[in-house]
């Protein structure tokens, strides 16, 4: 941990794990969307999950390269901005095409967050506390994932409908983005050549990595 970082700098970073759990709303949202659009079969509704989770395969390496260029904190802030925008789309326009766009953007934001958040944790806690902090972060993420379907069900029984979860998630994400943006965090310098496509795919020559 950088000595100049305040002990309170860990708080907005840990809040990022709560935002990370928002992506799991895609499961319950698929059921609600299918009910909202009559005649939608399972194959079509399955596009919602695909549009969300496909991006981890596509963007993990580019996000690592972006993180090397602009820094870990800025990458997390960008991921929050994309997530917040994604959550606003169904509020502005609710049809199946816009739902797909919204969850695709949610997947993009979550991919960037997953790639950048753990490295950012290393800048705000000591090496001795790193494992415990990341474990706590995963617990926070699990709690967020657990609360999502409960909130959606609560809103579904209200005058606002289940879609009210989107502006709530957007507001919480904007709060997380603002909190992290104003929190001073000194990052460790990263070598520009640390993450590249060539170096990443060269790992496939390692038979142990291929097996796993």
PLM feature spans:
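Conserved MFS/SLC helix-loop-helix module at the cytosolic interface between two early adjacent transmembrane helices
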Residues: 58-97
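Juxtamembrane intracellular "pre-TM" segments in multi-pass secondary transporters
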Residues: 1-3, 188-212
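Residue-level signature of mid-helix packing/kink "hotspots" within the transmembrane helices
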Residues: 24, 52-61, 146
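Helix-loop-helix hairpin linking two adjacent transmembrane segments in secondary transporters
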Residues: 136-184
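Cytoplasmic helix-loop-helix junction between adjacent transmembrane helices
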Residues: 102-139
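Extracytoplasmic
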Residues: 8-37, 118
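Short hydrophobic/alpha-helical segments at membrane-entry points of transmembrane helices
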Residues: 97-103, 211-212
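MFS 12-TM fold signature
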Residues: 82-87, 106, 172-176
């Amino acid at each position: 941990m950088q000595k100049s970082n305040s002990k309170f700098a860990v708080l907005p970073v840990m809040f990022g794990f709560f935002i990370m759990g928002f992506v799991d709303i895609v499961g319950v949202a698929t059921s609600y969307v299918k009910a909202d659009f009559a005649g939608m079969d399972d194959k079509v509704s399955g596009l919602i999950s695909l549009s969300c989770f496909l991006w981890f395969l596509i963007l993990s390496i580019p996000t690592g390269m972006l993180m090397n260029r602009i820094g870990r904190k800025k990458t997390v802030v960008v991921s929050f901005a994309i997530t917040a925008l994604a959550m606003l789309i169904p509020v502005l326009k609710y049809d199946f095409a816009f739902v797909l766009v919204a969850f695709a953007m949610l997947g993009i934001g979550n991919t960037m967050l997953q790639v950048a958040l753990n490295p950012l944790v290393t800048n705000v806690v000591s090496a001795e506390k790193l494992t415990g902090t990341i474990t706590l972060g995963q617990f926070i993420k699990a709690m967020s994932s657990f609360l999502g379907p409960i909130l959606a069900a609560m809103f579904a029984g209200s005058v606002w409908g289940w879609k009210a979860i989107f502006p709530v998630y957007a507001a919480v994400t904007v709060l997380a983005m603002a909190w992290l943006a104003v929190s001073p965090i000194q990052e460790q310098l990263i070598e520009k050549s640390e993450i590249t496509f060539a170096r990443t795919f060269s790992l496939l020559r390692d038979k142990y990595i291929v097996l796993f």
